[in-house]
Amino acid sequence: MEFYYFLYLAFLLFCFILSKTTKKFGQNSQYSNHDELPPGPPQIPILGNAHQLSGGHTHHILRDLAKKYGPLMHLKIGEVSTIVASSPQIAEEIFRTHDILFADRPSNLESFKIVSYDFSDMVVSPYGNYWRQLRKISMMELLSQKSVQSFRSIREEEVLNFIKSIGSKEGTRINLSKEISLLIYGITTRAAFGEKNKNTEEFIRLLDQLTKAVAEPNIADMFPSLKFLQLISTSKYKIEKIHKQFDVIVETILKGHKEKINKPLSQENGEKKEDLVDVLLNIQRRNDFEAPLGDKNIKAIIFNIFSAGTETSSTTVDWAMCEMIKNPTVMKKAQEEVRKVFNEEGNVDETKLHQLKYLQAVIKETLRLHPPVPLLLPRECREQCKIKGYTIPSKSRVIVNAWAIGRDPNYWIEPEKFNPDRFLESKVDFKGNSFEYLPFGGGRRICPGITFALANIELPLAQLLFHFDWQSNTEKLNMKESRGVTVRREDDLYLTPVNFSSSSPA
């Protein structure tokens, strides 16, 4: 139905767009005369290459096109010039050599505008002083190592309750994917808001709906110059409706925090405890943010923390468990390591997680094969430049296919094989300097929440491996991906836990 609606709109707009297409073709011809655009597949009138991106996962389709046209491609998605990078060398050009030229996000994606409270968040705000101030706040106060460590007791408590709940269902087939997702949301909710409340379940539901709605294709994004398309876009109104409900809950949470802001903070182990909303409101009160930090900005940042932090962590834990079920030798090796390190304690806490070198390799390998956001987030070229002799037009959307790069046979031995051992002696890390490995992006807009995400991945995985052996009632797991900005498995993971005899969660 959606496809026919798309064709209907394309037909109605044919005459109007054809004149613009002809004009733009004339403008683009200057590149063929003087500068050469990167290679790419043939285009058709109006749609450009948009029709080639239907019928499958976009990151798969782009990888296959790159095999034919090269690691630096030019596509036309409607009227939008789009550059696709599919190799470490091209990624380095974007994230390092020309980093500042690719530091912007597209400013004409309506869905981004709505959920980011008019581009006022950390993720999609325009590159400039405001973004630098937000980045400073996130790196120094919200998501710093010190801040993440301050939530250690929350993580340990939530994960232990999670383990007890699973232990009570021994021998019963459980939806582990759902349990993991609820756990990560629970940790993030307490870190952000201080406690779970009556709105938590509804908040999670709306956030999930928003994330899925943003990922849906919107014809208006293909023709940003045709403003009236937004007026007839069902996608826009769907996102706005969900976002208004989401905003009501966040507004209520902010109001509650403001009412208690002058009250003494809770005490734990002799230390004052602030949640992330407290931190943001304190910055707002101090007024030391160069640009005004209003409630709208705070709400946008809250959306970032949940949409990015929870999805990345829960998706990675889920994929890691799936891969270990498929590869029992890996599972056994990871279990032996964590049980050896924490044998005396009888339970896993964060004190010795750094000793779990093999588990860290499992996480790295999971992120190589299954980066949560396989195409990262799009960037926009701020001014015309050259990459490998090709012209990159100003205002082009730029996509880096991190999924394809992580499976590049020129850089990875047996790239389709799940083999954590490859990382045991490797210096490749998450920091964006290893361009063959970019699960969190790179350059100055690399994900600021890496530390927060990893903390929510390591402890749950270690506990699941320590306390239980796992049985799958399915001969062959479905490893197909779902659709969306964040790529989960198509099916939830159902497993049967068997309590490990030496474990005794207190």
Curated annotation (Swiss-Prot):
Its cofactor is heme. It catalyses: (-)-tabersonine + reduced [NADPH--hemoprotein reductase] + O2 = 16-hydroxytabersonine + oxidized [NADPH--hemoprotein reductase] + H2O + H(+). Pfam families: p450. The chain crosses the membrane at residues 1-21. Optimum pH is 7.5 in phosphate buffer and 8.0 in TRIS-HCl. One of its GO terms (biological process) is alkaloid metabolic process. Induction: Up-regulated by methyl jasmonate. Inhibited by cytochrome c, CO, clotrimazole, miconazole, tricliphane, flusilazole and tetcyclasis, and with a lower efficiency, by 1-phenylimidazole and piperonylbutoxide. Not inhibited by potassium cyanide and sodium azide. It is a single-pass membrane protein. Heme binds at C447. This is Tabersonine 16-hydroxylase 1. The gene is CYP71D12.
